[in-house]
């Protein structure tokens, strides 16, 4: 791009955005003219490629981290039969047509189902950086297409995954030359409800009890229709903003109706955690459920909830349940939004600064 040191104003030849090569003796060659009506004068501070290059280098650092830990990078399909069953998520669908044959496919909301098939086949340490898609999501923190990092360890518990994440955040912060989290904090859901809501939360806590708590705390729950809604509305208003943003916070031991693809511990809590930093929810981790019958029942319950909410009906991926039935070893895994982590590291407020 034409450098600031080159006095070209008033020239009939050069305009903002032209690309030139500076030669010896002050000569220059016009390499690529700007043929648009847009002025696109860039400095080192606002050069779009420099910012984009930093984003791609960041992804390379993530890959370097996992390769140093002897993880294998894998790839799952982009067109899938089941995009994921989480009730709150809307999906993108498409159709394969070959003559009279038609077959419906979806863009994945997560690569989780297919990654677990690899675990059932014998994979022990795997990761993927995948594009995922969630229809109807567009805010400063949400995008209908974003990038998910998922990694899994066979024969590992959640504490190992938690340690991985702490090391990853610190490794990337050092590579980007930004501040690490000031401190790592861990709370259970029950501890947080006791501390900030003066409420004894148990795995048996009912929807009516949460509704009464919301009314007591003056939390607006008019939009709530399920026990999950009451839980999250209270959590987001009274708990989520309580810890300092410069701390990396892990929240663990969730109620059983939010176990999702996690197993329950001996006390009846969902054995999973969520991670927060710099005001952002970054990741969800699970001590993975590997019982095919319980998993099928939970997945079908999710689909029933989707139907009740008026969302698009989808089917289950039978090959996933076949893989579980053949035997998936005890495993733990995590899904981390890498745009979110980059936003937390670089103090970026809008995901469009990365995605655009």
Task: State what each model feature region is.
Residues 75-78, 176-186:
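Short, glycine/acidic-rich hinge or "gate" loops at secondary-structure transitions
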Residues 2-160, 170, 218:
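Class II aminoacyl-tRNA synthetase-like tRNA-binding/catalytic domains
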Residues 58-62, 165-168, 210, 235, ...:
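Generic structural signal for hydrophobic residues
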Residues 8, 151-177, 313-325:
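Well-ordered alpha/beta subsegment
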Residues 71-72, 178, 198-199, 219:
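Short aromatic/hydrophobic-glycine micro-motifs
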Residues 77-82, 89-118, 125-154, 199-356:
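A translation/RNA-centric and nucleic-acid-associated enzymatic feature enriched
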Residues 180-200, 329:
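Short, conserved secondary-structure transition motifs
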Residues 66, 70, 192, 251, ...:
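Conserved hydrophobic/aromatic pocket- or pore-lining residues that grip, position, or stack substrates
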